[in-house]
C-alpha cells in the first residue's frame, strides 16, 4: 500500500493525516479519468443482506477496527471507504492495512466478511466536494461514457471510494467512482 495524505486548515493551524491505501499503477490519465491497475488487497465488507434494516455499515465496520473482532485487536484506519453502487443492497468496505494481511482478525459481526480484492484494471473518475446521490449519478454517467468511448467492458458494479472524514471541508474532499 502507498501512503496518502491530505492537508487541511483547522482554525489557522495545518493538520496532516496519513492513511494507507491500496497500491496501484496509473496506466492512462485523462483528467479527471484514470485507468488503474490495482494489486491484490484485502477488505472487510459489510453487506446489509444480513441486516436489511440498517442503511449504512460504517458503524459496524468502525467497531470492527476498534477491537470488535475475534482477536480483540485495534486495526488502523485506511482509505478509501468503498461502497458498491447497487440498487438492491448496500455494501460498504474498509481496506485492511498491509501489516494485518498475515493474520487478519475475523469479525464478530455476521454482517462482516473478510475478502481478497483481486488485482485488476479499474476505470476511475475523481471529484471533490461533498458526495451525494445526484453528484454520484452524474459522475457515474461520465465515467460510463468514458469507459464506452475507450471500448472497455465493465466487469462489476461501480463503486464509490470516499477518502475523507465527514468534518473535512468540501474544498479539501476527494472522492472517486471506480
Protein language model features and the residues they cover:
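A solvent-exposed interaction/effector surface
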Residues: 2-178
Amino acid at each position: 500500500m502507498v501512503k496518502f495524505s491530505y492537508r487541511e486548515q483547522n482554525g489557522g493551524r495545518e493538520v496532516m493525516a496519513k492513511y494507507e491505501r491500496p497500491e496501484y499503477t496509473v496506466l492512462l490519465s485523462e483528467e479527471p479519468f484514470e485507468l488503474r491497475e490495482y494489486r491484490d488487497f484485502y477488505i472487510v465488507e459489510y453487506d446489509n443482506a444480513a441486516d436489511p434494516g440498517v442503511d449504512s455499515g460504517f458503524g459496524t465496520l468502525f467497531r470492527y477496527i476498534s477491537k470488535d473482532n475475534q482477536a480483540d485487536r485495534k486495526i488502523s484506519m485506511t482509505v478509501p471507504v468503498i461502497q458498491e453502487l447497487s440498487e438492491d443492497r448496500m455494501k460498504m468496505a474498509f481496506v485492511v492495512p498491509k501489516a494485518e494481511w498475515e493474520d487478519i482478525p475475523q469479525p464478530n459481526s455476521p454482517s462482516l466478511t473478510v475478502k481478497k480484492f483481486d488485482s485488476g484494471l479499474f476505470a476511475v473518475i475523481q471529484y471533490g466536494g461533498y458526495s451525494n446521490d445526484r453528484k454520484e449519478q452524474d459522475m457515474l454517467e461520465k465515467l460510463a461514457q468514458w469507459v464506452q468511448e475507450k471500448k472497455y467492458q465493465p466487469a462489476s458494479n461501480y463503486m464509490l471510494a470516499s477518502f475523507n472524514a465527514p468534518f473535512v471541508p468540501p474544498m479539501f474532499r476527494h472522492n472517486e467512482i471506480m
